[in-house]
Amino acid sequence: MARSTQPSSLLRAAVAGALLTTVMAAPALAQERVVKIYGFGAKSGVVRIFGLNSEAAMKAAAEQINKAGGVTLGDGSKAKLVIEYLDDRCNAEEGINALRRIAAQPDAIVAVGPTCSNVAEPVFGILQKKAGDASDSGLQFPLYTDVAAKGGLASMSQWAFRNVPSEAAMYKSLMEWIKATRPDVKTFWGGVEKDFAHSNATYNLMKDQATKAGLEVQGQSEWLLADTSFSTQVREMKRAGTDMVALSAHPFTTCGVLKEMQRQGVKPKLLVGLTSSSSMETLQGCAVQAEGIIIPTSFAPVTPEAIKAAEAAQALNANMDLHNAAASKNIFTQKDLIEKNKLMARPDTLQADRQKMREALASMKETQGLLGKVGRTDDHEATKPFLFVQAKAGAWTVAERPAVN
């Protein structure tokens, strides 16, 4: 009898083991459902800090979403949000290649990026211009930009969307405020990173708005994004002796110019900076020399939500600024749109999900930003609240919150 029961016992043990394995595997399988949001931008090169900060902000947002239960898909199942971020090195060709690689993935519904305007413009150019146009073979993939800020780019394609502030509105308001509050400032000198699309475009806005505010534009100095010597340009400023110097430059060359201004004893009555330089990178690089500089920005840690977002980014060794603040909010917005529009996030629903995401982004009239409500325009741009910050004692302080907000 003992010999006859041994096979039966072994069989029962094997069945029990198989059932236990199945039961243990079931939760693991359930947890494997993911929604992947891709990003791309500059993670190397001179402006790499912006891409690195965007990636960190996106991952911090995803972490908050996952801790709260993840994303609810169209079939009611829960999915984990995963971020994958590609490096385009602020290079147009690499940006195009990055977006094509993303669009070729069977799990890619939408992407965030890029960092640089000189990448965004050609990238938007490969997208289908008018959604549903069978004669247009352009890429049919929704792109929600967080950083690239050159004006008007989203109108290039109905698949392109941006969550960047209007620098035209920001510098118009700033120059009007300077005119009203600083009657002693009458002359203007500009400095610009001549080889960078964003710097060039914004400098033209600064100069035009300064002229409209009644300031006398006396000239400009030019340098390149990768330059490290600015003695000639600062000598030009010194000879001009203007009341205001406006620098349309990113933190790296802004600090280089400010240090050279200190060395040569150039002390204008007022310093104005580029939106992108309203960052901790500027203060870490040249807080003493940047003392007093005024910059318009669409981010400052002045609301509970903004403080929370900044702390989440800091936990991943990143600083929050107007650019990656947008990257963070883009992730929360996409999570909401996935749920409201019942996206399935499966390979067999890929094209339908992309179309739903495009239509959802296009239909948005308003989103919630870190400083308040953000309006959406018909050409897929954002109307964001902003304020003016000033560098004081190694920190950014709010100088003014314009009434236009």
What spans do the regions from the language model cover?
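Extracytoplasmic ligand/sensor domains, especially the bilobed periplasmic-binding protein
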Residues: 108-220, 269-295
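Sec/Tat signal peptide C-region and signal peptidase I cleavage site
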Residues: 24-30
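Segments of small-molecule ligand-sensing domains
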Residues: 315-324, 335-398
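Extracytoplasmic "Venus flytrap"
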Residues: 38-59, 86-92, 115, 191-201, ...
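Beta-alpha junction/loop-to-helix N-cap segments that form part of ligand/metal-binding clefts
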Residues: 49-56, 71-153, 163, 223-230
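Bacterial N-terminal signal peptides that target proteins for export
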Residues: 2-15
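Short, polar/charged alpha-helical segment
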Residues: 50-74, 204-211
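Extracellular/periplasmic periplasmic-binding protein-like sensory domains
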Residues: 261-331, 339-342, 391, 396-404
